[in-house]
Amino acid sequence: MANIKSAIKRAKLSEERRSHNASIKSDMRTAVKTVETLVTNNDLENAKEAFKTASKKLDKAARKGLIHQNAAARQKSRLAKQVNA
């Protein structure tokens, strides 16, 4: 554990950011899984709506630096291919 005051503050801030980033990534993964389950159940109307939400969450995560922009684009492309099939 850190002994210096500034190091203690940095450790606390780092933990807060880690938990915040983890929640955003979790929401993103949940949105992607929702689209995939709706597609497998042939519920294409709801899948298209869920795809819009998932796309927004992927873009936001990429913008925040939680995932790479190309990774977000790749996931969106694969989801779009499933929804439009």
UniProtKB/Swiss-Prot annotation:
InterPro entries: Ribosomal_bS20, Ribosomal_bS20_sf. The keyword 4Fe-4S does not apply. The keyword Thylakoid does not apply. Pfam families: Ribosomal_S20p (PF01649). Keywords: Ribonucleoprotein, Ribosomal protein, RNA-binding, rRNA-binding. GO terms for biological process: translation. Transmembrane segments: none annotated. Binds directly to 16S ribosomal RNA. NCBIfam families: S20. This is Small ribosomal subunit protein bS20. It comes from Bacillus mycoides (strain KBAB4) (Bacillus weihenstephanensis). The gene is rpsT.
